[in-house]
């Protein structure tokens, strides 16, 4: 996979999609300093490993989940190397068993395709249909990294800016969850 070894600290003159440019301009408007990396499409966390070396930060795994009736939707942010077991999450948020939302639902609700889901896509959730869940270990790293609504670029910024600038600007409250597996299940 191609990853440009040069990083940038501002938006490019031109992007392939409007939503990518909106992501950069949103971060700049709210005073978030970021590092931007360009690369081939990285739709899985495994493909992001090369990008992580260039930006020197772990990329967050973003999952769009829904209840069985598909009436409640959740965006879950977890460390990229963490396994996700739905039973631990369902119990913590008092929900029936959760499943992955479809790509079609992702497009409709957040204007992104599978592999491009990001906390920044919440800017397209004007009706606030998505409940944000953040695994506690996401806050342990100094930096937070995610795609800018397309999976051919990645941005890295301070995790404190996620909490103190990004989420308030998105008008988002969130629930912290603990998804570490008990030792007997590892």
Task: State where each predicted segment sits.
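Extended, low-hydrophobicity, polar/charged segments
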Residues: 1-186
